[in-house]
Amino acid sequence: MAKKSAIEKNNRRKALAARYAAKRAQLKAAAMDENLSLEERFKARLKLAELPRNSAPNRVRNRCEITGRPRAFYRKLKMSRIALREYGSRGQVPGLVKSSW
């Protein structure tokens, strides 16, 4: 089980990323728009830099929904390899059969 503080920090990052997503997209579009003057584009970049760092979506870490483990994460199932193996052995993952020989 991961530290609760790390899981909560990641949840805060998810919330911040969702809250600032529209504003960030608007500023990025303005910064990349070649029809605007260089000065306006630069202002958009400065505004983008003023946003909280944790509002960037790439700072959000994929974590297992069950254990909170940050590594060996299966996106499709939203769980780590360890949780997947455990749940698969119990037959709780539809379509998954754990092989044994």
UniProtKB/Swiss-Prot annotation:
It holds the Pfam family Ribosomal_S14. GO terms for biological process: translation. One of its GO terms (cellular component) is small ribosomal subunit. One of its GO terms (molecular function) is structural constituent of ribosome. Part of the 30S ribosomal subunit. Contacts proteins S3 and S10. Binds 16S rRNA, required for the assembly of 30S particles and may also be responsible for determining the conformation of the 16S rRNA at the A site. Belongs to the universal ribosomal protein uS14 family. This is Small ribosomal subunit protein uS14. It comes from Hyphomonas neptunium (strain ATCC 15444). The gene is rpsN.
